[in-house]
Amino acid sequence: MKIGYIYAIENNLNDEVYIGSTLRTIEERFSEHKASARRRPTCTFHKFMSLHGIEHFKIIELKKIEVNSFFELQALEESYIRDYGSLNTINGVNKAAVHTRNEILVKRKIYSKECVKLPPLDEVIKIATKASLKKLEINEFIDLFIGEENKWNKMFDSDLSGIHISSLILNQLGYEGEFKNQQTCFKRFLKRNNIIIQEFSSSNPELKLYPSIQEEMKNMKTNVIANRKWLIANPRDLKKIIMKLNTKNGDAIREYYICMDELVQFYSQYSLSYDSNNN
């Protein structure tokens, strides 16, 4: 199990609030937000921070919880965003632009992230050199260019051998509509591409290992639970799914992995540059 946090970022200018989640400490996550606001703000919240000055913002812990994966944490985060996150963008809809929870749910669209875009190598080295006087570790280097909210590899980050393909994950993969429609389209995709994943029935004792499934079952009637099947994919199969994914988010996820590979190569160049200038 991992320790996760739901947090809020407030400011002393107005009542607007940003809700987020992290598997790091909230202090580390806040440092990332501030760095993104200073560097190259792209999302609504980081532009807001940059416009008004990061010195006007503070972070507070809302909830500490044990989870098996980052996606279980995101499922909880989403409920907090709907109720409190006036500076969040929910599935393509800026919550500050709507007024009631019902409006948010009605206007809810497919969850979509932009493709990660890296600056040229010389600019990458310049940014990394300015970021710290000491030599950055590779994870610190990557964090400068890919924020936690854009790390698609968290999809595979689980303490269990399998990953519950929940509505949230299907949203992340780019499947639209209600859960039943999402699951139907996803199963067709699996069959078409000869990818076989597990289906757990309610009698499977392993269900109790998945908090996200247990949470779903709380809101189901007994007869619905008895007939329900839960999809479980191991990390290797999920990677195969990503490679063949033809939804709106497919290219963005694959582009992320290309950028990760480029950053590993860029880090080697940064290391050579740092060592050359500090010896």
Curated annotation (Swiss-Prot):
Chain ranges of the GIY-YIG domain: 2-90
Domain of life, source organism: Viruses
Entry-linked SMART domains: GIYc
CDD domains: GIY-YIG_HE_Tlr8p_PBC-V_like
Family: Belongs to the IIV-6 019R family.
Annotated protein name in UniProt: Uncharacterized protein 019R
Native source organism of the sequence: Invertebrate iridescent virus 6
